[in-house]
């Protein structure tokens, strides 16, 4: 007897104590009072009570609640797991019990029809017969079979007082041999927890309750090898030899000498017609003929172990009749091509005119959502082009058998030779049997489908392509191993190859209509190094082409390969297998290369087992087939298993070091403690963190756009001309050119753009080489007094921005209000602040003794030239002629205009490209001055005071006459 407990003390009660003595608190449920019988009750009531005609009257119940409560009700168990929980029992009146048991059991049930589960009675676990011993001939009990039972006794004989009881249990699943739970319209595989309460009464002595739990069989698809490849050889039959058919004598076989076996769904072997492949060429026709060749071109499983002769056609040369033994399997059907070897004079002709087809499924197991790649290799005798040349369909085959036989291996062999399993006809209706041999039913469900074009090389008539089909996400694992194969669900890949090139005429557009793009593959031919033609298809949610009628078309070869849909992949968990690909792309490699590590041996080539007994050697003999050049999957590190290896190529160590720099250690930022900061400071720092960040290079280039703020104290700074003469500052020479110091009263609106403080950048962040335009630029010159320190920036974009700003702010060449000076005399130059020259003008500096190729003008150049000179004015000697000894050249001529609205004055400069840089006025005029001055010094001072808040200073615009 198992332990039981009450609500007050769950584990304190002894296992051997009677339930009546347990410390159970009575439930506060009210008891129904028994009806008192009166002496004057009528005889009619006693009669009705005796006949029990009042079934609707409420009866007193001793047990109010009886149910099972698992500890983890939503868990999916596996083989070997423990199932823990409690049986809850609520008693309202004292009740005497014999015992209380709990049972964990699994069973298989097959219904007779789609709706029979509602009509058939519910079977008790005790009524379901257990599996019979090996060798015993016994049918399963009317579509029922028990998988296992694990029983535990919770309470023995005793009395239960009113109260609420909980009996804990711990049950165990077997270690192996349990299929996954499934419920469908024709059967079920279920696992139940059943609690049974037995009372010492003759009427309804047992009361039961049950709880359903779910089990998932753990299938590891990692160690599974791919299915064995199938090779089909088609050899021609001469038309002349076909007409000559002697009655006896020598015979010649025309079928391939290869025989391959594989599992095939039985529903595909219902028709016994032979598959024929015809070619309309003048040489003859291609055909596959055989006694055991079924509808799809594959042989059915023979019922006895005997030799099956191959149907052959006669020929001109002598040949021998060849037979091949059939291989019998106890629980599977066979998929074989039976043939005999070609002998005689026609061997060379047959080898040259043989069509070879090889189909390989590159994965033997997969998980839901995975992609199954399929490789097809064709060596044809002519050029074919079929846009639906390869059709790959993934389907699930369900098989149920309501009355299987439990036979041993010896009995199974015996049943193949006698009429035990397939009895003779008892009705005389040509094989019609009314026995239970027809209790098996099979169903097919197409899950997904993919199409791929088959285009052979016009040179060697060969093609190799790789396509794929996707397993739906909602697919459940393969179910096998049920006793007697009462219920089984298996997955197959059907590959249909159109060797005649006429399949498109039979599709009539039905292949692509209503279907969406499904699994994508890469398809190509051996003469194409890169596959460019994607495959298309459909899934279970869209229309899928019915391939049953296509398999009867001449020139169509089908094949079937079983794949296992599992729950785990040990290779993938270790990082050695391919990860599950995406829905929009299928890993596929042209030329037949794949990423399955089981297909690649340690020597860098494909295993010889694929080509055993085919007589043609490895397909790598084709010069266009280079699939063996790909490295195996196991050469890739763990980080590169997320995608197929052909696009995750890892370079060698030398290339890796050159391509990827060494990582730099970046220490974590030193964040101050904000607890000591004020709220205002924390808000300000939070706002700064929200500002967009800048990368180091971008920050260096953008910071170089700023210019230093000129200070009045630096107005007398003169750059060192020796640096310019040596050519050490050829990239930022324009920054050393002086500009007028802007006062707050006369500041230009563009000075604010140059106002931000400039932060020097490291030398490695600056431009490393000049442009061609800068190399063609002549060396700069230092002239006149400098009014601001030279800029430290060397950014070319900043120099270009300054030049554009200067051009935008310059006045037009000839303003609209231009009036030539009637006096023709020179004009007194203005001061650096934009007013006319006064006594406080700075003294001029001596010119530099070399000349540029073009004049460079700035705002303070008015200090060095006199006004009033028109375009027809006199020319002056060059400043370089007196110092450097150069020849005299004409100096640019200027016209001063003080009538431009909004400015103090403007000067238009007219010059030629060969003019030297303007020198101060002291270089051209004597100290006394010889020009005409329009304003006196007093008027100039008044004008300067009145224009203290004037807009920009005087500006100059060079004009070159060529």
From Swiss-Prot:
SUPFAM superfamilies in the cross-refs: E set domains
UniProt feature, compositional bias: Basic residues: 237-246
Region (Disordered): 1-43, 225-326, 568-675, 689-962
Listed Low complexity bias regions: 696-722, 738-747, 830-839, 913-928
Entry GO CC: cytoplasm; cytosol; plasma membrane
MF-aspect GO terms: protein-macromolecule adaptor activity; ubiquitin protein ligase binding
Pfam family, one: Arrestin_C
Highest taxon listed in the record's lineage: Eukaryota
InterPro entries recorded: Arrestin-like_C, Arrestin-like_N, Arrestin_C-like, Arrestin_domain-protein, Ig_E-set
Cystines in this chain: none
Biased composition (Basic and acidic residues): 793-805
Example GO BP: ubiquitin-dependent endocytosis
Compositionally biased intervals (Pro residues): 840-849
UniProt function note: Required for the proteolytic cleavage of the transcription factor pacc-1 in response to alkaline ambient pH.
Family, similarity comment: Belongs to the arrestin family. PalF/RIM8 subfamily.
Protein name per UniProt: pH-response regulator protein palF/prr-3
